[in-house]
Amino acid sequence: MRRRRSALLAGSFALLAVVGGIAWQTKLRRPEGRLTGVGPRMVSNQTSQPVSLYGENLRRGMKLRLSEPFDRAVPMTVVDARHAYARLPSDLTLPVGTAQVTAALSIDGQRTRSEVGLTVVNDGAFADYTLLVRSGDVLWAASTTTDALVRLDPSTGEVSHLPGGDGPSALAAWTEADGQPRLAVAHTWTPELWILDGRTGAVLRTLRAPVYATGVAVDPHRRLVVLAETVENTVRALSLDDGRELWRRDVLPDPRPLALAGDTVVVGSQGSGELETLGLDDGRTAESLGPRPGTPIVGGHTEPHARDVMGGKAPRSLLWSSSLGKLFVTSIGPNIGPNPQRMEVSMNGGVGVVDLAARRFERHLGFGAGVTEGMALDEGSKRLYVADVALGLVRALDAAALVSGDDGARKAELWRLPVLPPPDFPLAREAADYGVNGRAGAELHSGPRALALSASGAQLYVLDRFTATVAVVEDARSSQPRLERQIPLETSIGPRERRLGQVLYYADMGRSGMSCDSCHLEGHDEGILFEKTHPLRIYRSPTVRGTRETPPYFTPASTGSLAETSRVVGDRNRYMNPTLTESEVRQLTLFSATVTNLPNPYRGPDGAPPVSIALPGGGIGRPLEGRRLFDSKADCVRCHPPPLFTTDQDLSTRGHFIDVGTPRAFPLRTGDQETVFRGVGVPSLVGAWDVFPMLTTGLAGFREENGRAVPADRVPLRAMIERYSAPPHGNAAALDAQEKADLLAYLLTL
């Protein structure tokens, strides 16, 4: 019996050895998983980021490995042997002095060397203060990139940093019926609206709110809080007390600033340049407003071209005067379209006046230079203060004169005050080069972005974006205001080269009205322009986000790198007054190269597309089914291959301009456009969910109507599929309705 048991045991061990050997040999023969690409190739570390992974022999259970300086393993969601997704964590921390790093990506445990790199931009340590409000006796400022919410007591200069949530993106202050000051904080990535004690910053309650919030306004009497967001492009009203959604309305693309105006709220569309009014009680909308052909332009080089106006440009700030019954809007001015003189510099920054009751954009006061943004109004003295981020100036205007008529508006400026940067702030070039030959002064390094008034109106507070300071202007109501002091919000400006590149991106050194930001607001798209290139015609103004990987630039191609673009366009913007130095080219190139795509909001918590998504404009789409169609029946992948979905991603296929049968010119005064056609470039589809308009002409988004450009498509991706996707531009026209919905769903997740 013992011998039999021993024999059985021996046989069992032998069998196990054989099975184990077979398994071991099978494992050895199993091909090693490896990565071949990642999209996007550059991300920000300011929040968690979804990425698409491409490779060979990918299997479930694999992890993504990030090399030094992170040395992290991240879970992967593997779809098939060639496709996977991951979500990078939000704590990829880098030293304050580091602008960016490139880490190697590989499969965790991969033995062969990986050639796939991912650049991580250090936005999480690059403070960028753009928001300022007064609540009671204290000021509140916020930096979206660094998640900073800052309390500032201007009487003492005391600065306190509080957690701001994931990407604080909009602030609103008000006073409750019992006299208590309150502060609302909306967010880009935290799906919450915070209600804070306006004195201390203590969180009183948290309301569920949409992500990608871009504007917030509070009506304490109606107990309403109104938010704008840019994923679904809606404005929503929530109960201030319990957060219930009271109404929701679709609005024009990329809604940004909000202003309460009596029983309505006004929202400005960055994509279309239009204004919309919504009733506070029910969200009812009226026809949009904006500059129209013939809208008076008072001052600046575009004044003779009022008849050539084809629409508006992005409203940068809105402010309602209850005493004057007018709305003020800052922008780079009415959008000048094709004209017999071929004048193609539409930028004329200033302030517009809108009569909401008459539904009329009354006039635009142009300053002829700079980019006007933030505003503050002293209702008592009827003084309107405006900040110029491109020139480093603050102006005071007689608001009553501004609304009185064109003649009054021409004389409305009361004073202008340069806001010089602190003495230890670096300059982009020699100090002697500023303020001569008609150039802007060294004050352009400060970047006045937002304004707030003291309760008495005697002090004006200026949030300077580039220096991260709040400047205190005394005697604001007098004819001789003075810059009393500057209060720093941060101890470091971050990487010197990148910060100076930011200054150069926004600056109007040559006082031409042109800057990188005037065409590409905050590094993104901004409607259409009758533009400074040849052939001279109407083009869409494309995004800068993620473009470092996809030269050449312009249509037809005129610059082959970001550095060449910085040189050529930078010099042109200044009218060569002066030409950029080599260091300025380097700094501007660095900043432009660190403008990243936003995290895709259509991805799930694991970074992968969900099984299905609700589509903007209606319907349900299945992204993974859409990918299969993209790669086959719809024939999109031929010109838009992954990982960046453009043939410009690789040197061997870069710069091939083609004719795919899409419209060649925008049909507005074509006799004043150069309609010669040399082909179109292939845009990247990464981040396409947030692009408006599409096509080189902008005709997936706008149409011509009565001599102007009218926003026509709220979802340009849908317009592309339904109107512009017959051969030779792919073959989505052959898809049935559900297949088109699936393809749209996939494109939204790129």
Residue ranges and their predicted role:
Residues G21, T130, G312-S317, S321, ...:
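Periplasmic c-type cytochrome electron-transfer domains
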Residues V121-A125, L162-D166, T206-P210, R248-L252, ...:
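Surface loop/turn motifs at the tips and blade-to-blade linkers of beta-strand repeat domains
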Residues D123-D147, S169:
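Beta-strand-rich domains and repeat architectures in extracellular enzymes and scaffolds
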Residues L139-A141, R182-A184, L224-V226, V265-V267, ...:
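Conserved beta-propeller blade signature
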Residues T146-A148, T190-P191, E232-N233, S272-E274, ...:
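Short glycine/acidic-enriched loop and turn motifs that connect beta-strands
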Residues D153-G157, D197-G201, S239-G243, G279-G283, ...:
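Short loop/turn segments that connect beta-strands within beta-propeller blades
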Residues G20-M62, F70, G109-Y129:
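Beta-strand/beta-sandwich contexts
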Residues R134-G136, W174-Q180, V218-R222, L260-G262, ...:
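Residue-level detector of Asp-centered blade-edge/turn motifs that repeat once per structural unit
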